[in-house]
């Protein structure tokens, strides 16, 4: 077994960078490893049009480390009021690559999200026409639906209908967490793919709930039982081009996580590819990591793969106990614990 692993530089097809004073920290962490990233638009207020996307993009570019060539790929936030013209203008911009469906109330800053899928059908039709991807947070939000069942119910009630109604629309089912989601993506057309996070590959709900509640494992969609974790590992390491890397790295300040009503999100960008390497190594599938991390995503988006490389070294190191987050701190996933792979830094 080799102690070095060289990959084409990967991309992150789902990340939250937040905004304002934290950007120099979050952008530096993602740019350290990834060539490009799909930037989530759930700011306050959300990124609803091309003009707002461009302004956010400029703030991200301004926060890059001096020598970085990291490229943010922007996303529109779909609302009940999104028009076909909004979609066409965004597509014509050249820097908006997708639009994001957040069911209203499903996750952080989703209150402005879609209240009924039918209300965005004109926008979805325009997206299919111009070749803009639909990114989906796939959970229903009705109070009577158990939080562990919300992904499966979303597939049955909404996602099947969208895929059938718009067969030419490319759809990314984001941060999938269940065996049912894996099966849906595998059985769907070539226009349907999914991202998988490192934390859903490495952990299940026992890690969050057994022996005490561990708030830094709390995310949405929530960690599921170990049988679903196994299905995700099977999918990620299968070599199928339908599955690719999306960290859903989602920082919240320490006080907002360690709270009587803590926020959902795991901060993994500081060591994302290292965490994925651990998951793939558990399956003796390090040979499949480059496809998952560096090739499948660009192919689905119709973009070229990166041409430069990164190198991972089998070398244990201790994750920081905390990281700067503007004037506050964020507790990263695996804080203070040992990681088995290290990204080789080049002078």
Curated annotation (Swiss-Prot):
EC number: 3.5.2.3
InterPro entries the UniProt entry points to: Amidohydro-rel, DHOdimr, Dihydroorotase_CS, Metal_Hydrolase
Binding site for Zn(2+) 2: 100, 137, 175
Classification via Gene3D superfamilies: Metal-dependent hydrolases (3.20.20.140)
UniProt: Zn(2+) 1 binding residues: 14, 16, 100, 248
Cofactor note: Binds 2 Zn(2+) ions per subunit.
Transmembrane regions: none
SUPFAM superfamilies: Metallo-dependent hydrolases
Keyword Metal-binding: yes
Swiss-Prot/TrEMBL GO biological process terms: 'de novo' pyrimidine nucleobase biosynthetic process; 'de novo' UMP biosynthetic process
Molecular function as annotated in GO: dihydroorotase activity; zinc ion binding
Keyword terms: Hydrolase, Metal-binding, Pyrimidine biosynthesis, Zinc
Top-rank lineage group of the source organism: Bacteria
Pathway: Pyrimidine metabolism; UMP biosynthesis via de novo pathway; (S)-dihydroorotate from bicarbonate: step 3/3
Residues engaged in binding substrate: 16-18, 42, 137, 220, 252, 264
Catalytic activity field: (S)-dihydroorotate + H2O = N-carbamoyl-L-aspartate + H(+)
Active site, renumbered: 248
Residue numbers of N6-carboxylysine PTMs: 100
Function: Catalyzes the reversible cyclization of carbamoyl aspartate to dihydroorotate.
Protein name: Dihydroorotase
